[in-house]
Amino acid sequence: MGYCSGRCTLIFICGMQLVCVLERQIFDFLGYQWAPILANFVHIIIVILGLFGTIQYRPRYITGYAVWLVLWVTWNVFVICFYLEAGDLSKETDLILTFNISMHRSWWMENGPGCTVTSVTPAPDWAPEDHRYITVSGCLLEYQYIEVAHSSLQIVLALAGFIYACYVVKCITEEEDSFDFIGGFDSYGYQGPQKTSHLQLQPMYMSK
């Protein structure tokens, strides 16, 4: 009963991860955040494989899913540090999340709750011609805190998924070992008793 509830919980966690990361992927696309887009895409694939492994009782898939969650937590911790400008990181000057190919920022920077965007003219000389120079004011919640909230939610789901993935793998392995112990995985097939036929040889006489 406990194994069934743990497996169902892991399926629910995988479903929640897919919903949350798809929502995050949409806004990362809108903000041209290429590094998060790539990480989200890999995460979606791994979560689907983990979900498949949970449904089909495939411990290898679940183990791979658990290993990826460790990397996923590490990535989200980095994103939190980036937006909170921990150490030498700067969300204003570093273009790590766009692979240094554009000056785009998080979509929430201009579209956060209560934000008012004002175009600045004339633009500074250093501003690229194909970019707007704007100021954002009046936000009820700054965009970096929205991004931190997204990453924090992903970390919570990943930790829960890791715990239940380890539990489900343990239960599946123990179940396979017990089944093997009683002879469930014998390589030879069962052969029923064979009937032996007794033939009586009698001499035959041919008339001339």
UniProtKB/Swiss-Prot annotation:
GO terms for biological process: regulation of sodium ion transport. Pfam families: NKAIN (PF05640). The record marks 91-92 as: Breakpoint for interstitial deletion to form SUSP1-NKAIN2. The chain crosses the membrane at residues 1-23, 35-55, 62-82, 153-173. It is found in: Cell membrane. One of its GO terms (cellular component) is plasma membrane. The keyword Zinc does not apply. Its main location: membrane. Keywords: Cell membrane, Chromosomal rearrangement, Membrane, Transmembrane, Transmembrane helix. It comes from the Eukaryota. Expressed in fetal brain. Weakly expressed in adult brain and thymus. Not expressed in any other normal tissue examined. It is a multi-pass membrane protein. Belongs to the NKAIN family. It is linked to A chromosomal aberration involving NKAIN2 is a cause of lymphoma. Deletion del(6)(q13q21) within NKAIN2 and involving SUSP1 generates the SUSP1-NKAIN2 product. Interacts with ATP1B1. This is Sodium/potassium-transporting ATPase subunit beta-1-interacting protein 2.
